[in-house]
Structures are given as C-alpha cells and as structure tokens.
Amino acid sequence: ASLQAGPEAGYRPVTPRLEDAFIALLGGGPGGDSTLAALMPDHHSTLQQGPVIEAQGLTKRFGDFTATDQVSFTVQRGEIFGLLGPNGAGKSTTFKMECGLLRPSAGQAKVMGYSLSKSPGKARQQLGYMAQKFSLYGNLSVEQNLRFFSGVYGLRGRAQNEKIARMSDAFGLKSIARHAADELPLGYKQRLALACSLMHEPDILFLDEPTSGVDPLTRREFWLHINSMVD
C-alpha cells in the first residue's frame, strides 16, 4: 500500500474538546519556546536533499501471518509524518523495520540515504527511536539511563557529562537523577525516554505512540518539544 501525501498544512477553526476546556481551567498549559531547541544542533545545512526516510514495498511476515504488506512512503526533511491505524495494523512493525530492529521479509528501508540492510550501522547513527513502552532500564537511575544510552552512541568523558547535565535541565530531570526509572510517574518516564533518544543528536527521530496514557498537560509539553526541533 503506497501512502499518498496529504493536503497542504493549514489552520481552520474546530469545536473545542473536553481536553481543551480542562487545559483552559489550568491556565492554558505549556507555551512559549522549548529550551530543547537551543540544545539540538541545526541540521539544516547537512541534511541531504530529497527524502530522508524511505519505505519501499516493506513487507513483514511472521509465519503465515502478514503484518505489513507492500508499504511504501517517503518523508521529507522537516516533516512530522505519522502513521494512523487501529491496533494490529502494523504501525510498530513498520517503525521497527525503518529503525533496523526488524528485518523485512521483502522491500527496503532507508534513512538519510543509507539502506538498513546494507549499511545498518550508518543508518542507525542518524536516527533516534522512542519506543511505545519507552525502552528504559527500570532498575537503573535516571542519570544511569542517560549515561547508558549516550554511551551506546559513543559519548564519553566530559562531552557525555555536559550532555547529561544539559538534557537533565531541559527535561526537568535534575531533581530525580538518582530515582530508578521504574519508580517514575508515566510523564517523567516519557521525558526520560525522549531525552535518551536525543542524546546523540540524531537527524531523524522515530516516535512510537509517544503520548499514549499520559495526561493532557504532559502531552502538550511533549509536542512543544517536538515542534521546536522541526527545521
């Protein structure tokens, strides 16, 4: 199934929802600019021209069951691109193939021009992945999770310590640095998971249902961070 581009982005009035009324009662929720934008490098001049994410006929079979069937789409630089569908539609499976966590039964996945099958190391270095269940190590502290994920991508010594400090400030994690990840409320787990996925300053960020189960204020704060990073 080839995904076609949607209409041009724009604004139109909509009927307020219950969540909107709730946010208004709390003073309007988070606003302004995210501090995260100042911490992330400007990739505008280094990103390649053309699609930065490509799915070409991606198919995944588990025995006799076909989870995805000939999925094709492209994502351009600066786009926030989403996959919509019911549970079991194959969204997470598609994400995992694009991140190199699952090998396709057929088709090809590319990130920044690198094939996940031919150059998996180079492709993975370009991307960050925030999984649906956050993929944190529950028995490790907040700081230890940040140190582990940054270390996986080669950050060491002073550079690593400085990045941990900056991310902890940006996401409000300093006061809970020694708390185990399993002890955190869902909203803080979300903040930590996003921070971990950004430690190596990736060009591309994959988010698998990142706001599922969190409260409206936390959800809006999350998208404030995401929108601040768009070129």
Region spans (language model):
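N-terminal accessory interaction module
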Residues: 1-2
